[in-house]
């Protein structure tokens, strides 16, 4: 009953102009039809269970990656405007803004970024095979040219242990372990240098939701951070108390010339000195 109430409320908010996305299909259907007011496009997302439905609700109906909240400040130019201007500068220079989606789950976040930044190049990572296949299905259903890897992200390439805490398909974790071959891990640096791009790309955004893996990711090899003007991360001290999973991230970001803004479950880390636009160097 709760999801029907949420669905009805979301329709009312869309009608009065307060929401960007509209879920057209009733919640019980496995094939969900959506509409995006901003791009004037409809799209499809297949769901397996309630966990998928709530994931979509967070991404689209709560619009959790929106930058619109950054307009409420005292500066003449908002951070949202700066980021959008930088995105437009990249495309005007003939490059594609590179977005790396670490922890794509069912593909909803990658679809969101594709709709919001349609001229971008998106690399999506997901450790769980069932989530990876679901994500692949949803991306193909919308004919999106997004590269999706059945890998996890880490500070360096390697392998890790797959961990299912029993909290549903949006809570799978991986712990780096050289003796394990459960999950293949790839670093941000390797993604940038080793993946073959048909187009010229330049760093733009990294989204990180890796269920505590941020502790290892931000432990070393962090030079890539300065190249990405926008990081969006969900931290997980609440999920793994007394394990200081967010400590390395907080230490790293505090040393950078970046703003640090909380919204909902996510932290938005925004550069105060946007990097020079350049094509990624493969050497």
Language-model features: where?
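Phosphate/nucleotide-binding beta-alpha loop and adjacent structural elements of enzyme active sites
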Residues: 1-283
């Amino acid at each position: 009953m709760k999801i029907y109430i949420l669905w009805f409320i979301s329709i009312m908010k869309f009608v009065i102009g307060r929401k960007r996305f509209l879920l057209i299909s009733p919640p019980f259907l496995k094939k969900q039809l959506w509409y995006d007011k901003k791009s004037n496009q409809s799209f499809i997302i297949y769901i397996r269970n309630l966990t998928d439905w709530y994931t979509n609700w967070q991404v689209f109906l709560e619009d959790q990656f929106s930058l619109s909240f950054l307009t409420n400040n005292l500066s003449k130019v908002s951070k949202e405007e700066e980021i959008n201007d930088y995105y437009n500068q990249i495309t005007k220079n003939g490059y594609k803004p590179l977005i790396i989606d670490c922890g794509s789950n069912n593909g909803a976040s990658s679809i969101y970024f594709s709709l919001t930044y349609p001229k971008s190049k998106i690399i999506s990572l997901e450790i769980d095979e069932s989530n990876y296949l679901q994500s692949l299905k949803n991306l193909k259903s919308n004919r999106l040219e997004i590269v999706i890897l059945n890998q996890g992200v880490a500070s360096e390439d390697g392998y890790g242990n797959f961990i299912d805490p029993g909290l549903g398909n949006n809570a799978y974790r991986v712990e780096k372990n050289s003796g394990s071959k459960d999950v293949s891990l790839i670093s941000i640096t390797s993604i940038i240098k080793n993946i073959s791009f048909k187009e010229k790309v330049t760093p733009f955004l990294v989204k990180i939701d890796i269920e505590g893996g941020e502790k290892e990711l931000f432990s070393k090899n962090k030079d890539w951070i300065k190249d990405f003007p926008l990081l969006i991360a969900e931290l997980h001290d609440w999920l793994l108390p007394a394990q200081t999973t967010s400590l390395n991230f907080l230490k790293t970001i505090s040393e950078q010339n970046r703003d640090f803004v909380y919204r909902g479950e996510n932290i938005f880390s925004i550069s105060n000195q946007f990097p020079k636009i350049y094509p990624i160097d493969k050497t």
